[in-house]
């Protein structure tokens, strides 16, 4: 067992090593024009609400009861983050230590359920014409937000020069919740059959990793924007990866 003083020295040495690694693999991070912690929180909330909305709408479309809709919303919103934390060795996952994201997910699901319950005509064929467009937008926003959050989480705990890990964690954080949602709805995961999806996450994660040593806030914003733009363009113009018909 290490004494408190030895623990303090060890943590200080690790922090110094971490800063040296950041200087070695990039430049010193410039002073952010935005409070990074606040930016991360805002992006997490945006992603949580967007993914919770997409999960809830799938549940409503599948005629699930209120509990089913809530479960779909929560698992879509936090599923990717749980997988990320397990990969990074964060135990227990942040979802269980800070339940605010589950609370936002439940609130989002309940609001959508009540709206659709009262306005049942919103589920008719004319309203459903817009369903796919709304789903694409919500999914793109959630995908972009959680992709950069995944990269930032791994970066902050010291995996600065593990580029493949940063990419993997960014993508799995972005697509994990959607995969869980689709499997719970007994659908082939969106990532495997629809227009370019994981590739959009991969591109945004790459931009975020490339710019992270220079300016963390800007790298996260630009990375998320890249994901959203690519995903929406891919859905609009039907960009697909090759497959056997």
Whereabouts are the PLM-identified features?
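N-terminal topogenic module of multi-pass integral membrane proteins
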Residues: 33-91
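Long hydrophobic alpha-helical segments typical of transmembrane helices together
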Residues: 214-245
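Loop-to-transmembrane alpha-helix initiation sites
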Residues: 97-102, 162, 193-201, 215-224
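Interhelical loops and loop-helix junctions of multi-pass membrane transporters/channels
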Residues: 90-100, 117-142, 151-163
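Helix-coil boundary and interhelical linker segments in multi-pass alpha-helical membrane proteins
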Residues: 34-39, 86-96, 151-165, 210-218
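Transmembrane alpha-helical segments of multi-pass membrane transport proteins and ion-pumping complexes
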Residues: 48-56, 77-78, 82-86, 105-118, ...
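Structural signature of hydrophobic alpha-helical transmembrane segments
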Residues: 37-48, 97-107, 162-173
């Amino acid at each position: 067992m290490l004494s408190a003083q030895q623990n303090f020295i060890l943590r200080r040495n690790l922090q110094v090593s971490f800063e040296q690694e950041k200087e070695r693999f990039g430049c010193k991070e410039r002073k952010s024009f935005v409070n990074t912690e606040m930016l991360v929180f805002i992006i997490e909330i945006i992603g949580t609400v967007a993914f919770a909305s997409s999960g809830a709408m799938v549940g409503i479309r599948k005629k699930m009861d209120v509990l089913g809709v809530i479960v779909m919303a929560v698992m879509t919103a936090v599923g990717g983050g749980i997988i990320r934390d397990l990969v990074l060795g964060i135990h227990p996952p942040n979802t269980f230590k800070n339940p605010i994201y589950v609370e936002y997910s439940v609130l989002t699901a309940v609001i959508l359920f009540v709206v659709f319950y009262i306005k049942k005509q919103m589920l008719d064929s004319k309203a459903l014409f817009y369903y796919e467009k709304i789903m694409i937008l919500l999914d793109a926003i959630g995908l972009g937000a959680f992709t950069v959050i995944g990269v930032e989480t791994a970066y902050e705990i010291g995996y600065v020069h593990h580029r493949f890990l940063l990419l993997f964690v960014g993508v799995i954080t972005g697509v994990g919740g959607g995969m869980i949602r689709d499997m719970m709805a007994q659908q082939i995961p969106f990532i495997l059959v629809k227009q370019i999806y994981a590739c959009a996450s991969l591109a945004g994660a790459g931009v975020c990793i490339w710019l992270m040593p220079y300016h963390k806030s800007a790298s996260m914003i630009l990375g998320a924007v890249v994901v959203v733009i690519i995903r929406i363009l891919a859905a609009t113009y039907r960009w697909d990866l090759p497959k056997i018909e």
